[in-house]
């Protein structure tokens, strides 16, 4: 686990959000997300390789990331991706909080539209 992952784990814990680390999200594939908020079907990835000359910045790395995002979407997950700097400056946890609030509003709206008997 790197520094940004450790910090995001602290932020999620401070907000009282239960999460899983290195969560396998696609059956039959060896794909894992850095964090999963299971109750919200939200995966969180911290992409640091671009900044450190890692695989994410290569053509092959970009194609792998596209495949991973598509696999998550096909398995009904929503995905947020952040850089280590966004975790450190608070952008990531603020975005996660806003996203979870939007999910709650969406659920309320769906409930209001469902027919009653």
Question: Over which residues does each language-model region extend?
Answer:
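Nucleic-acid endo/exonuclease domains
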Residues: 1-117
């Amino acid at each position: 686990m790197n520094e940004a992952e450790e910090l995001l784990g602290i932020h999620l814990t401070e907000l009282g959000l239960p999460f899983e680390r290195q969560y396998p999200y696609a059956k039959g594939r060896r794909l894992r997300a850095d964090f999963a908020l299971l109750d919200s079907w939200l995966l969180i990835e911290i992409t640091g390789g671009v900044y450190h000359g890692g695989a994410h910045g290569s053509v092959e790395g970009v194609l792998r990331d596209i495949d991973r995002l598509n696999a998550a979407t096909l398995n009904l997950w929503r995905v947020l991706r952040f850089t280590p700097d966004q975790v450190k400056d608070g952008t990531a946890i603020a975005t996660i909080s806003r996203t979870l609030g939007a999910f709650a509003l969406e659920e309320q709206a769906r409930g209001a539209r469902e027919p009653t008997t």
